[in-house]
Amino acid sequence: MSARRLARRAAAGFAAAALAGLAALLAFGYRSGGDDADGAPALQATAEHAARGAYLARAGNCAACHTARGGAAYAGGRGIATPFGTVYASNITPDADTGIGRWTSTDFWRAMHHGRSKDGRLLYPAFPYTSYTRVGREDTDAILAFLKTQVAPVRQANRPHAVRFPYDSQLALAAWRGLFFRPGGFEPDAARAVDWNRGAYLVQGLGHCSACHAARNVLGASSAPAALGGGLIPAQDWYAPSLAAADQAGVADW
């Protein structure tokens, strides 16, 4: 067999392997979180649950993104600039038609834990589900109880995202998830105190501190949630200082 034919076969084999790998990556990224069974009890929207949810919603600063300047609370519409285009926050008021009024607790859990909407769409990681995946089910249920019972419904359609091709496709999101996202939960450190673990749970999960205070790669993925060494917030020209270095935010010395 000639060297040219061997080279062609090798190239064809490499291409086939690359395509197979890409297909596996897309399948993994797209299917992740798509087949959860709803084994959880019905949402307990009691006053106690709603009060806990209000506390958690403040801890996660949900209103900051989901409220447009001068707009109704939690009604969405605020644009979040990214290097790939602008993502507009959604309406999370309990309006049945334009908000999350028809969402079940599992729909909400799937969005928080898996980054997947009620209709099955993959969500843009501008919604920091890469951090929220560590939030426990009891806490996501409490947040939903607050949103459904303590927030006024606002009829306001979600604004379409303005994200450039090819980043605007579900295939691109599936590939990104296959590379950079794994659903998971918070793993407490048995060697640490209860308060330390509670703080780590908030910092790495609901507080999503790494969304600003950690460096990102060219595809927008941030480093590990515990790596809070500071980073430039993409498309905003603002540097979020290190939360560890004494010569920056200096939180370690507080």
Task: Describe the role of every protein-language-model region.
Residues T82-D107, T130-E138, A226-W254:
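Electron-transfer interface patches adjacent to heme c in soluble/periplasmic c-type cytochromes
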Residues R155-L171:
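Extended, well-folded interaction surfaces typified by the phenylalanyl-tRNA synthetase beta subunit core
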Residues L56-A96, I100-G101:
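Extracytoplasmic/periplasmic/luminal assembly and interaction segments
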Residues S2-A37:
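N-terminal type II signal-anchor transmembrane helix
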Residues G21-A27, T104-K118, S131-Q156, D253-W254:
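C-terminal capping alpha-helices of c-type cytochrome domains
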Residues A57, V87-A89, L122-Y124, G207, ...:
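Extracytoplasmic
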Residues G34-R58, A175-Q204:
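Electrostatic cytochrome c docking/interface patches
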Residues G53, A59-R69, F108, I143, ...:
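The canonical Cys-X-X-Cys-His
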